[in-house]
Structures are given as structure tokens and as C-alpha cells.
Amino acid sequence: MIRSSFVRSLPAVLTAFVIASCSGAGGVDSTGPLGQSPDATATAGSGLELNALWWKDWHRDVVTVSKTIDATGGTISIPETGLTMTFPQGAVAAPITITVTSDAEYVAYKMAPAGTKFLKDVIVTQSLSTTEVAGETLKRQLSAAYIADDTVSLSGKVPVSEIEPSYTTFSAGSSPLPLAHTWIIRHFSRYMLASG
């Protein structure tokens, strides 16, 4: 009986150990969402330029999803790109139709209505299985970046306005691979996943 209990809990213990060991010195924080801390704030990106991540399959179809979110909260997902947005209860005071459009080449999204501000943090999770880093070890830390100008090209170095509080989730094992990147947003318009 004790042995079967130990065997059942072993995967959870090993996962916790791997996560703890990955959060030490090095690039990526995989410990938990910074958005859960009241002190977590976006970092001003003034003068900062980053490279947008590419989709794994070039020239991916642009996907647009719309959904009405009300004061009870809700979720918007784009399965084709691996995006999930979770709106907690109280994020908006009144019903609002949210539209999210993926970029054809880069791991980036336009979110509307532009200028929308949220009363509570919205949690965004991007599966990395659809991106250029799928199945690869990370060479550089990933960042979720806000781009104030919806018309700026995402090719090359992209000027960003904010770096959002975020973390990367990794697989367990001797060579952890990135699985997803999660960040918080407090307002809309355009966001991308990027590296330095």
C-alpha cells in the first residue's frame, strides 16, 4: 500500500525537482506566473528591440477568433496556433466582443478592440509546439512583448513598448524542452513572442 502511494507520487515529485533545478542560474524562469504577484508589472521596453519568433510552418493561415467576454470571465482559444487567453471573473465590467487575429509568419497577435484595458490580469498561454522552438532547447530566454504600433513590420529587430511578466514551462527529463510560454496582459493591442 505504501509502495503504490510512493509510485503514484513519484512523477509529481520528479516534475517539481526538474522545475526547481531549471529555475536556477540561466535563462528562463519556469517557476510560476509572475502575474500572480501584485508587484508584477510590465517592464518598459523603450529603446529595446527583439526578434519575433517564427511559426514552425511558414506562411501559416491567418486565423481570427471573436468571442464576447462578460463580467463572469471566459476563455478564447485558437487551436490552430496554440493560443489560449483566460479572462478571470471581473476582468471586464460589461460584455465586450474580443477579436484575436494571428500573424501569418510570426508568433504574434493583434487583439481588439485596441486600447481595451482590463480590471484584472488576463492570462495568455502560447503552446510552443507550433513555433520554431518546438522540440529544441532554448538558446535564449523568451519574452512576451507589447508592440504599440499595429503597423510595424515584425521582420528583423522589432521595437517593443513593454516586456510582459511571463514564464516558460518545460518538459521533465535530462534535457528539458520548452512546452509553453505564459504571460499576463492588462491592455490590448498587439503582442508577440520574442527572443533577444
Question: Could you describe each region identified by the protein language model?
Answer:
Residues 18-21:
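C-terminal motif of bacterial Sec signal peptides marking the signal peptidase cleavage site
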Residues 104-112:
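Short beta-strand elements of extracellular/lumenal beta-sandwich folds
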Residues 91, 104, 128-130:
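A mature extracytoplasmic/lumenal domain signature
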Residues 86, 125-129:
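Short edge beta-strand/loop segments characteristic of extracellular beta-sandwich folds
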Residues 2-11:
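Bacterial N-terminal signal peptides that target proteins for export
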Residues 23-84, 90-98, 114-119, 132-196:
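Proteolytic cleavage junctions
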